[in-house]
Amino acid sequence: MNDYKDIWIFAEQRNGKLMNVAIEILGEARKLADKKGVNVGAVLIGHNVENLSKDLISFGADIVYVVDNPLLSNYTTEGYAKAISELAKEYKPEVILYGATFIGRDLAPRIASRLMTGLTADCTGLDIDENGLLLQTRPAFGGNLMATIKCPDKRPQMSTVRPGVMKRAIRDDTRDGKVIKFDADINESDIRTKILSIAKEAKNVVNLEEADIIVSGGRGIGGPDGFNIIKELADVLGGVVGASRATVDAGWITSDHQVGQTGKTVRPKLYIACGISGAIQHLAGMSNSGTIVAINKNPDAPIFKFADYGIVGDLFKVIPVLIEEIKKLK
Protein backbone atom coordinates (compact mmCIF):
# COMPACT_ATOMS: atom_id res chain seq x y z
CA MET A 1 0.00 0.00 0.00
CA ASN A 2 3.04 2.26 -0.11
CA ASP A 3 2.13 3.04 -3.73
CA TYR A 4 -0.89 5.03 -2.53
CA LYS A 5 -0.42 8.68 -1.66
CA ASP A 6 -2.16 12.06 -1.78
CA ILE A 7 -5.59 13.10 -0.58
CA TRP A 8 -8.26 13.67 -3.21
CA ILE A 9 -11.62 15.34 -3.17
CA PHE A 10 -14.47 14.94 -5.63
CA ALA A 11 -15.00 18.55 -6.78
CA GLU A 12 -18.73 18.41 -7.35
CA GLN A 13 -20.01 21.01 -9.79
CA ARG A 14 -23.45 21.63 -11.19
CA ASN A 15 -24.02 23.70 -14.30
CA GLY A 16 -20.41 24.84 -14.22
CA LYS A 17 -20.51 26.08 -10.61
CA LEU A 18 -18.61 24.47 -7.76
CA MET A 19 -20.81 23.32 -4.90
CA ASN A 20 -20.10 24.80 -1.47
CA VAL A 21 -19.39 21.36 -0.05
CA ALA A 22 -16.55 20.89 -2.55
CA ILE A 23 -14.83 23.99 -1.16
CA GLU A 24 -15.52 22.83 2.40
CA ILE A 25 -13.95 19.40 1.97
CA LEU A 26 -11.11 20.94 -0.03
CA GLY A 27 -10.21 23.00 3.03
CA GLU A 28 -10.28 19.89 5.23
CA ALA A 29 -8.25 17.90 2.71
CA ARG A 30 -5.62 20.64 2.78
CA LYS A 31 -5.28 20.28 6.56
CA LEU A 32 -5.03 16.49 6.37
CA ALA A 33 -2.53 16.60 3.51
CA ASP A 34 -0.33 19.11 5.32
CA LYS A 35 -0.33 16.81 8.34
CA LYS A 36 0.85 13.91 6.17
CA GLY A 37 3.12 15.93 3.90
CA VAL A 38 1.32 14.95 0.69
CA ASN A 39 -0.52 16.73 -2.13
CA VAL A 40 -4.20 17.54 -2.44
CA GLY A 41 -5.86 16.40 -5.65
CA ALA A 42 -9.23 17.64 -6.88
CA VAL A 43 -11.19 15.52 -9.35
CA LEU A 44 -13.22 17.67 -11.74
CA ILE A 45 -15.66 15.88 -14.03
CA GLY A 46 -17.99 17.23 -16.69
CA HIS A 47 -17.83 18.94 -20.06
CA ASN A 48 -16.21 22.35 -20.61
CA VAL A 49 -15.47 22.71 -16.90
CA GLU A 50 -11.68 23.06 -17.01
CA ASN A 51 -12.05 26.76 -16.19
CA LEU A 52 -12.90 25.73 -12.61
CA SER A 53 -9.39 24.33 -12.16
CA LYS A 54 -7.99 27.74 -11.19
CA ASP A 55 -10.65 28.11 -8.50
CA LEU A 56 -9.79 24.71 -7.05
CA ILE A 57 -6.08 25.54 -6.98
CA SER A 58 -6.84 28.88 -5.31
CA PHE A 59 -8.85 27.05 -2.64
CA GLY A 60 -6.03 24.62 -1.86
CA ALA A 61 -5.62 21.93 -4.52
CA ASP A 62 -2.10 21.10 -5.69
CA ILE A 63 -3.28 19.02 -8.64
CA VAL A 64 -6.59 19.16 -10.52
CA TYR A 65 -7.51 16.04 -12.48
CA VAL A 66 -9.89 17.05 -15.27
CA VAL A 67 -12.04 14.44 -16.97
CA ASP A 68 -13.77 16.25 -19.83
CA ASN A 69 -16.22 14.36 -22.01
CA PRO A 70 -19.54 15.36 -23.63
CA LEU A 71 -21.02 12.15 -22.18
CA LEU A 72 -20.28 13.54 -18.71
CA SER A 73 -22.11 16.84 -19.23
CA ASN A 74 -24.76 15.71 -16.76
CA TYR A 75 -24.29 13.42 -13.80
CA THR A 76 -24.85 9.74 -14.42
CA THR A 77 -23.90 7.05 -11.94
CA GLU A 78 -22.19 4.83 -14.48
CA GLY A 79 -20.23 7.56 -16.26
CA TYR A 80 -18.89 9.30 -13.18
CA ALA A 81 -18.16 6.05 -11.33
CA LYS A 82 -16.17 4.67 -14.26
CA ALA A 83 -14.23 7.90 -14.74
CA ILE A 84 -13.17 8.23 -11.09
CA SER A 85 -12.43 4.51 -10.75
CA GLU A 86 -10.12 4.59 -13.78
CA LEU A 87 -8.45 7.73 -12.49
CA ALA A 88 -7.91 6.22 -9.03
CA LYS A 89 -6.45 3.03 -10.47
CA GLU A 90 -4.00 5.09 -12.52
CA TYR A 91 -2.84 7.58 -9.86
CA LYS A 92 -3.54 5.65 -6.61
CA PRO A 93 -4.75 8.23 -4.07
CA GLU A 94 -4.60 7.23 -0.42
CA VAL A 95 -7.83 9.05 0.46
CA ILE A 96 -10.86 10.23 -1.53
CA LEU A 97 -13.43 12.56 0.06
CA TYR A 98 -16.90 13.31 -1.32
CA GLY A 99 -19.64 15.66 -0.22
CA ALA A 100 -22.63 13.82 1.24
CA THR A 101 -24.97 15.33 -1.36
CA PHE A 102 -27.44 13.22 -3.32
CA ILE A 103 -24.74 12.85 -5.98
CA GLY A 104 -21.97 12.02 -3.53
CA ARG A 105 -24.13 9.51 -1.69
CA ASP A 106 -24.98 7.78 -4.95
CA LEU A 107 -21.48 7.91 -6.42
CA ALA A 108 -19.14 7.04 -3.54
CA PRO A 109 -20.47 3.53 -2.78
CA ARG A 110 -20.30 2.58 -6.48
CA ILE A 111 -16.65 3.61 -6.60
CA ALA A 112 -15.92 1.83 -3.31
CA SER A 113 -17.36 -1.33 -4.83
CA ARG A 114 -15.34 -0.98 -8.05
CA LEU A 115 -12.12 -0.37 -6.10
CA MET A 116 -12.97 -3.02 -3.48
CA THR A 117 -12.41 -0.66 -0.57
CA GLY A 118 -14.37 0.70 2.39
CA LEU A 119 -16.55 3.79 2.74
CA THR A 120 -17.67 5.74 5.79
CA ALA A 121 -20.81 7.77 5.12
CA ASP A 122 -21.97 11.11 6.53
CA CYS A 123 -18.78 11.99 8.39
CA THR A 124 -18.76 15.03 10.67
CA GLY A 125 -15.07 14.87 11.58
CA LEU A 126 -11.81 13.77 9.95
CA ASP A 127 -8.27 13.45 11.26
CA ILE A 128 -5.01 11.53 10.79
CA ASP A 129 -3.83 9.12 13.50
CA GLU A 130 -0.28 8.39 14.63
CA ASN A 131 0.06 5.72 11.92
CA GLY A 132 -1.11 8.00 9.13
CA LEU A 133 -4.56 6.41 8.83
CA LEU A 134 -7.67 8.47 8.20
CA LEU A 135 -9.90 8.76 11.27
CA GLN A 136 -13.51 9.08 10.12
CA THR A 137 -16.03 10.24 12.73
CA ARG A 138 -19.78 10.03 12.22
CA PRO A 139 -22.95 9.89 14.36
CA ALA A 140 -24.24 6.43 15.22
CA PHE A 141 -27.22 4.94 17.08
CA GLY A 142 -29.55 7.81 16.28
CA GLY A 143 -26.97 10.46 17.08
CA ASN A 144 -26.49 9.26 20.65
CA LEU A 145 -22.95 8.06 19.94
CA MET A 146 -20.07 9.28 17.81
CA ALA A 147 -18.19 6.45 16.09
CA THR A 148 -14.64 6.80 14.77
CA ILE A 149 -13.85 4.41 11.93
CA LYS A 150 -10.61 3.35 10.24
CA CYS A 151 -9.91 1.48 7.02
CA PRO A 152 -6.44 0.01 7.69
CA ASP A 153 -6.22 -2.70 5.03
CA LYS A 154 -7.76 -1.22 1.86
CA ARG A 155 -6.99 1.77 -0.33
CA PRO A 156 -8.15 4.34 -1.03
CA GLN A 157 -9.75 5.25 2.28
CA MET A 158 -13.06 6.91 1.40
CA SER A 159 -15.58 9.12 3.18
CA THR A 160 -18.61 11.20 2.38
CA VAL A 161 -18.72 14.40 4.43
CA ARG A 162 -21.83 16.25 5.48
CA PRO A 163 -22.28 19.66 3.87
CA GLY A 164 -21.85 22.51 6.33
CA VAL A 165 -19.65 20.57 8.76
CA MET A 166 -16.25 21.73 7.52
CA LYS A 167 -15.18 25.34 7.24
CA ARG A 168 -14.86 26.65 3.69
CA ALA A 169 -11.32 26.86 2.39
CA ILE A 170 -9.87 30.35 2.20
CA ARG A 171 -9.17 31.50 -1.33
CA ASP A 172 -5.58 32.40 -2.21
CA ASP A 173 -5.18 33.45 -5.84
CA THR A 174 -1.38 33.46 -5.52
CA ARG A 175 -1.29 29.65 -5.25
CA ASP A 176 0.14 27.61 -8.11
CA GLY A 177 -0.92 24.13 -9.08
CA LYS A 178 -0.94 21.59 -11.86
CA VAL A 179 -3.78 20.52 -14.15
CA ILE A 180 -3.78 16.96 -15.48
CA LYS A 181 -6.23 16.06 -18.24
CA PHE A 182 -7.31 12.44 -18.02
CA ASP A 183 -8.96 10.71 -20.96
CA ALA A 184 -11.30 8.20 -19.34
CA ASP A 185 -12.59 5.41 -21.56
CA ILE A 186 -16.25 6.44 -21.49
CA ASN A 187 -18.60 5.22 -24.21
CA GLU A 188 -22.33 5.56 -24.73
CA SER A 189 -22.69 1.85 -23.97
CA ASP A 190 -21.30 2.48 -20.46
CA ILE A 191 -24.22 4.73 -19.57
CA ARG A 192 -27.51 2.92 -19.13
CA THR A 193 -29.62 6.00 -18.49
CA LYS A 194 -30.40 8.74 -20.98
CA ILE A 195 -31.42 12.21 -19.85
CA LEU A 196 -34.37 13.40 -21.91
CA SER A 197 -34.94 16.72 -20.17
CA ILE A 198 -34.00 18.56 -17.00
CA ALA A 199 -36.56 20.35 -14.84
CA LYS A 200 -35.28 22.95 -12.41
CA GLU A 201 -35.97 22.38 -8.73
CA ALA A 202 -39.23 23.80 -7.47
CA LYS A 203 -38.78 26.87 -5.31
CA ASN A 204 -40.18 25.06 -2.27
CA VAL A 205 -37.37 22.49 -2.25
CA VAL A 206 -35.47 22.89 1.02
CA ASN A 207 -31.75 23.50 0.63
CA LEU A 208 -30.57 24.11 4.17
CA GLU A 209 -26.89 23.49 3.44
CA GLU A 210 -26.68 26.33 0.90
CA ALA A 211 -28.87 28.82 2.81
CA ASP A 212 -27.43 32.07 4.19
CA ILE A 213 -30.35 32.56 6.59
CA ILE A 214 -32.24 29.84 8.48
CA VAL A 215 -35.15 30.32 10.87
CA SER A 216 -35.79 27.15 12.86
CA GLY A 217 -38.71 26.11 15.03
CA GLY A 218 -38.62 23.78 18.02
CA ARG A 219 -41.06 22.20 20.40
CA GLY A 220 -41.88 25.66 21.75
CA ILE A 221 -43.91 26.52 18.63
CA GLY A 222 -46.63 24.27 20.04
CA GLY A 223 -47.69 22.33 16.95
CA PRO A 224 -47.56 22.17 13.15
CA ASP A 225 -49.41 25.49 12.80
CA GLY A 226 -46.59 27.16 14.68
CA PHE A 227 -44.43 26.84 11.60
CA ASN A 228 -46.62 29.40 9.83
CA ILE A 229 -45.04 32.26 11.76
CA ILE A 230 -41.59 30.68 11.41
CA LYS A 231 -42.04 30.61 7.63
CA GLU A 232 -43.29 34.19 7.63
CA LEU A 233 -40.13 35.37 9.38
CA ALA A 234 -37.95 33.27 7.08
CA ASP A 235 -39.68 34.68 4.00
CA VAL A 236 -39.28 38.31 5.04
CA LEU A 237 -35.58 37.69 5.67
CA GLY A 238 -35.10 35.77 2.41
CA GLY A 239 -34.24 32.61 4.34
CA VAL A 240 -35.47 29.05 4.69
CA VAL A 241 -37.24 27.11 7.44
CA GLY A 242 -35.36 24.71 9.68
CA ALA A 243 -36.61 22.49 12.48
CA SER A 244 -35.51 20.56 15.54
CA ARG A 245 -35.67 16.79 15.70
CA ALA A 246 -38.52 16.95 18.22
CA THR A 247 -40.80 18.70 15.73
CA VAL A 248 -39.92 16.24 12.97
CA ASP A 249 -40.49 13.24 15.24
CA ALA A 250 -43.85 14.73 16.24
CA GLY A 251 -44.85 14.93 12.58
CA TRP A 252 -45.16 18.72 12.58
CA ILE A 253 -42.83 19.15 9.58
CA THR A 254 -40.97 16.95 7.11
CA SER A 255 -37.49 15.60 7.82
CA ASP A 256 -35.83 17.60 5.04
CA HIS A 257 -36.08 20.63 7.37
CA GLN A 258 -34.30 18.92 10.27
CA VAL A 259 -31.13 20.52 11.62
CA GLY A 260 -28.90 18.59 13.99
CA GLN A 261 -26.70 15.59 14.45
CA THR A 262 -29.25 13.26 12.85
CA GLY A 263 -30.46 15.90 10.39
CA LYS A 264 -28.48 18.42 8.38
CA THR A 265 -25.40 20.28 9.51
CA VAL A 266 -25.61 23.92 8.50
CA ARG A 267 -23.36 26.97 8.53
CA PRO A 268 -25.55 29.96 7.56
CA LYS A 269 -24.61 33.58 8.10
CA LEU A 270 -27.67 33.94 10.36
CA TYR A 271 -29.45 31.24 12.36
CA ILE A 272 -32.58 32.12 14.36
CA ALA A 273 -33.69 29.44 16.84
CA CYS A 274 -37.31 29.87 17.89
CA GLY A 275 -38.67 27.78 20.75
CA ILE A 276 -35.62 25.52 20.66
CA SER A 277 -34.17 24.62 24.05
CA GLY A 278 -30.72 23.72 22.74
CA ALA A 279 -30.21 19.97 22.98
CA ILE A 280 -26.64 18.96 22.21
CA GLN A 281 -27.77 17.03 19.12
CA HIS A 282 -29.31 20.20 17.67
CA LEU A 283 -26.35 22.37 18.60
CA ALA A 284 -24.03 19.97 16.78
CA GLY A 285 -25.82 20.83 13.55
CA MET A 286 -25.80 24.63 13.76
CA SER A 287 -23.16 25.80 16.25
CA ASN A 288 -20.84 26.99 13.47
CA SER A 289 -23.38 29.50 12.16
CA GLY A 290 -22.09 33.05 11.66
CA THR A 291 -24.58 34.70 14.02
CA ILE A 292 -27.02 32.83 16.26
CA VAL A 293 -30.19 34.46 17.60
CA ALA A 294 -32.31 32.59 20.16
CA ILE A 295 -35.93 33.32 21.03
CA ASN A 296 -37.26 31.36 24.01
CA LYS A 297 -39.52 32.13 26.95
CA ASN A 298 -37.33 30.06 29.29
CA PRO A 299 -34.40 32.27 30.40
CA ASP A 300 -32.47 29.15 31.46
CA ALA A 301 -32.70 27.41 28.06
CA PRO A 302 -29.24 26.04 27.10
CA ILE A 303 -29.51 27.66 23.66
CA PHE A 304 -28.78 31.07 25.20
CA LYS A 305 -25.25 29.95 26.15
CA PHE A 306 -24.45 29.52 22.47
CA ALA A 307 -26.40 32.45 21.06
CA ASP A 308 -24.83 35.75 20.02
CA TYR A 309 -28.14 37.45 20.76
CA GLY A 310 -30.96 36.22 22.97
CA ILE A 311 -34.56 37.32 23.34
CA VAL A 312 -36.47 36.01 26.36
CA GLY A 313 -40.15 36.08 25.54
CA ASP A 314 -43.13 34.42 23.89
CA LEU A 315 -42.11 33.78 20.30
CA PHE A 316 -45.69 34.40 19.15
CA LYS A 317 -45.37 37.96 20.48
CA VAL A 318 -41.72 38.55 19.60
CA ILE A 319 -41.69 37.32 15.99
CA PRO A 320 -44.58 39.52 14.72
CA VAL A 321 -42.72 42.57 16.06
CA LEU A 322 -39.53 41.44 14.32
CA ILE A 323 -41.40 40.93 11.06
CA GLU A 324 -42.92 44.41 11.17
CA GLU A 325 -39.59 46.07 11.97
CA ILE A 326 -37.83 44.19 9.17
CA LYS A 327 -40.53 45.23 6.70
CA LYS A 328 -40.01 48.88 7.69
CA LEU A 329 -36.34 48.58 6.76
CA LYS A 330 -37.14 47.37 3.25
Swiss-Prot record:
SMART domains: ETF. One of its GO terms (molecular function) is flavin adenine dinucleotide binding. GO terms for biological process: fatty acid beta-oxidation using acyl-CoA dehydrogenase. The keyword Transport applies. Binds 1 FAD per dimer. Coiled coil: none annotated. Gene3D superfamilies: HUPs, TPP-binding domain. Its cofactor is FAD. FAD binds at residues 270-298. Signal peptide: none annotated. It comes from the Bacteria. SUPFAM superfamilies: Adenine nucleotide alpha hydrolases-like, DHS-like NAD/FAD-binding domain. Belongs to the ETF alpha-subunit/FixB family. Heterodimer of an alpha and a beta subunit. This is Electron transfer flavoprotein subunit alpha. It comes from Thermoanaerobacterium thermosaccharolyticum (strain ATCC 7956 / DSM 571 / NCIMB 9385 / NCA 3814 / NCTC 13789 / WDCM 00135 / 2032).
